Regions:
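Acetyl-CoA-dependent GNAT
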Residues: 5-85, 92-102, 150-154
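Residue-level detector of beta-propeller blades
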Residues: 58, 129-131
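Conserved phosphate-binding and hydrolysis motifs of nucleotide-dependent enzymes
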Residues: 60, 86-88, 115, 126
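Short aromatic/hydrophobic contact patches that present stacked aromatics
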Residues: 75-77, 108-110, 146
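Conserved GNAT acetyl-CoA-binding A-motif
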Residues: 99-110, 133
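Conserved beta-strand-loop-alpha-helix junction that forms the acyl-donor binding cleft
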Residues: 109-119, 136-141
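Conserved active-site tyrosine of GNAT-family acetyltransferases
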Residues: 122, 127, 147
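Terminal substrate-recognition subdomain of acyl/acetyltransferases
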Residues: 139-155
């Protein structure tokens, strides 16, 4: 089994990010969208890489923006050849670890209503459906399910 290492994404990773994005989504983000998120101090941009003993390739990534009241998951993608191996779970769990001191914000995301595997993953990690954004996706006007993970209540 492949060993995965998580680290902050860098501008040097853009080529691999874009390749995974193109292989994952019908309407991929532009390079400028990735550059903008990578440059924002309020963003968390994590990459999952094969361990150095292997080829060190990027196999997945997570991009999150800090909003006033929530951490918003902007983009999660895993290379199709590495799906089903827990990469997205590792990335999201690292997000929760990194934001533990600020978890009162909670977490939000949108996901295609047809993406049952992603919805199942998010539910396993504590996200719950909070509504729909009708016609959200521009490629086919598919609805997005709005999901939220409530802030951690500190005793």
């Amino acid at each position: 089994m492949t060993t995965i290492e998580l680290r902050q994404l860098l501008l040097d990773d853009l080529g691999e990010i874009e390749e995974i994005e193109r292989r994952s989504y019908p309407t991929p983000w532009s390079r400028s969208m990735f550059v903008g998120e990578l440059a924002k101090p309020s963003s968390i941009c994590l990459g999952a890489f094969e361990a150095e003993g292997e080829d060190g390739a990027l196999v997945g990534y997570l991009i999150v923006s800090r909003y006033v009241d929530a951490w918003h998951v902007m983009n999660v993608a895993v290379d199709p050849d590495h799906r089903g191996r827990g990469v997205a779970t590792m990335l999201l769990e690292r997000l929760f670890d990194l934001t533990a001191d600020d978890a009162r914000r909670g977490y939000t995301l949108e996901v295609r209503v047809s993406n049952e595997k992603a919805i199942d993953l998010y539910e396993r990690l504590g996200f719950r459906s909070r509504g729909l954004r009708r016609g959200y996706y521009t490629d086919n006007r598919e609805d997005a399910l709005i999901m939220c993970k409530d802030p951690v209540t500190l005793a």
